[in-house]
Amino acid sequence: MSNPAVASEHYINRELSWISFNERVLAQALDTRTPLLEQAKFSAIFSNNLDEFFMVRVASLKAQVEAGITKTSADGLTPLQQLLTIRDHLVPLIEQQQDHYRKHLKNQLVEHGVHLLDYEQLNPKERLWIDNYFQTAIFPVLTPLAVDQAHPFPFVSNLSLNIATLILDPETGQQQFARVKIPQKTIPRFVEIPPDLSGINPKPVHTAVPLEQVVAFNLKLLFPGMKIEEHYFFRVTRDADLELRDLEADDLMSAMEQGLHKRRMGGEVVRLEVTNEMPQRVVEMLIEGMAVEEKDLYRIEGLLGLDDLFGLMRLPLEQLKDQPHIGLTAKVLSRSQRRMLEDESIKEEEFKSIFSVIRRKDILLHHPYELFATSVEEFINQAADDPLVMGIKITLYRTSKDSPIIAALIRAAEHGKQVMALVELKARFDEGNNIQWARHLERSGVHVVYGVLGLKTHTKTILVVRKEKERLRSYVHIGTGNYNSKTSRLYTDLGLLSARPELSQDLVELFNYLTGFSKQQSFRRLLVAPVTLRKGMESLILREIEHAREGRGGHIRAKMNALVDPAIISLLYEASQVGVRIELIIRGMCCLYPGRKGFSENISVISIIGRFLEHSRIFWFANDNNPEVYIGSADLMPRNLDRRVEAITPIEEPEQKEHLERLLNLYLNDNREAWDMQSDGSFLQRQPNPNSEEHRAQQQLINLWQQGIPAA
């Protein structure tokens, strides 16, 4: 079905919707109920998110402006209007973040023995120690760069922290400008000072001073014979988006490496951050030297680059962090549960196999509450070592360093199995890591492919082929999250282990589509982008519309990271207007307006921001009291529906459908970490009534799993 584009007055600008999401992240940092070091972490996430937003989204808009493009977005704004509006929204948020760091976070940390000091606050013993540290550990790696007729303005790399200094030559009386880059990639941003030197009783747990201040107050050693008159800090963000035309690249890996080199060098400057005290005349030197526009200048009252607050999470102050969470092995995969499932006739070696459990029943996994290591990684590990397994195929979008899954794939190849890995080289900001893994896998005998021309492969799928009683049986994993051991502990994701023949055959054909010249146009059970997912999702919504029109009611529940696609939004509006009840749980961007009388009054939207990043996608359709439920890798965005390879699988087991419905209920009833989207597009955080019980979905899920209650 083809839907008309949604009217601009009914569509929220995606960039502003993203800023609203990041504002909710910042709110976690500002919330005094958040443990103190977790506040620092959320502040760091806010900054890191903002860096990527400028490197990709703002860079794209600036490129459009420079190209003279005036075409409006779905909400009716030109690229230039979007840039100006983005700035207006960001400035107060950045001020809130800095205000929180200066006035709250630093002071509260002192109460727990953590002193984040300015250089000028150090006592004489501490200054002596830090100055000696500068000479031995910092000074040798610094390179001061002067700017004059013989020395053009130096290149300033992306996300680098720098000192702009004005120095005076006493002999000539001439003032010169110089730039010093802070070596923050090789030296910690906060330089720790031995607590014994503080003279404070009781002794601090941790005393540190910002690295850039250590350098700034020792500049005289970099410019002997010169007088340091002024110094100021600045930070640069450059265009870091890689857009490669696959058809023009004979060797995609080579093209990616060239693109990564360009990224390291950096594209056009898209943001210049300076400390608030920098005078305009110095700002103008930077603007001229780096060809920056005035509207890209951000004055910051405080430390630049607060993403480095991530480092505070390493402090041994567990009482200032969320309680540690270690997931459990999925009950059906635990050894005691397996023993109950097995027939007495089954041999001991078969009892040990995860495949025997999957054959009996689909397994629905929920991370991080259920361990990734004892489910997905165990699935791959057993496949690698099982002599009956003939082949393994997997899609890799983002994976972790020292990945157990990579190790298992290599081991499988060494055992003589047919192993194929699709490594998506275009996974943004993981391109370099994926290139290294691709080469490592190839050297180990794994067949490595890079996907379909013109598409990014985002699906999370594994296919294992096993020889059983003179026949081949396939086992599959289809998930919502990456095969990444680290993020599996931090993100909420779902996965399905199954041996259903129709799913297995669909995955065989999907991998053929990814690795060969297959032009598969239909699948039995999977919804696959860009082939069947858009049409399938539209059909499911249209069916609810038809039920509502015929008086049978209609109900849609969906959980995702983002809802941006205008055609899907238009259909949801239509569904609301005929009485379909629509409940959406959307962590990030949402471009529809809910709750508008006579238009979208049957649509509600909440966003959950908690200790775990909500990453799972669930699509639930009432279907006249015969629910259909899907999970998978896709959000409802044009890129996911049309420009990526995605896979969404139906959930077939009735108790697993019920489990996902209970899960959605938990999220919808959250009154602590849920934000209600208002009819004007803004969000309000829910607050539990003083006399009511607090419901935090993520904490409730931790508690339920610890009690052994969930059964899927």
Curated annotation (Swiss-Prot):
Pfam family, one: PP_kinase_C
Residues bound to Mg(2+): 398, 428
Positions bound to ATP: 49, 491, 587, 615
Main enzyme class: transferase
Coiled-coil positions: none
CDD domains: PLDc_PaPPK1_C1_like, PLDc_PaPPK1_C2_like
Modifications made to the protein after synthesis: An intermediate of this reaction is the autophosphorylated ppk in which a phosphate is covalently linked to a histidine residue through a N-P bond.
Keywords: ATP-binding, Kinase, Magnesium, Metal-binding, Nucleotide-binding, Phosphoprotein, Repeat, Transferase
Names of the cofactor(s): Mg(2+)
One GO-annotated biological process of the protein: polyphosphate biosynthetic process
EC assignment: 2.7.4.1
Substrates-to-products reaction catalysed: [phosphate](n) + ATP = [phosphate](n+1) + ADP
One GO location term (cellular component): polyphosphate kinase complex
Entry similarity comment: Belongs to the polyphosphate kinase 1 (PPK1) family.
Known role: Catalyzes the reversible transfer of the terminal phosphate of ATP to form a long-chain polyphosphate (polyP).
The name this protein goes by in its record: Polyphosphate kinase
Natural source organism: Prochlorococcus marinus (strain MIT 9313)
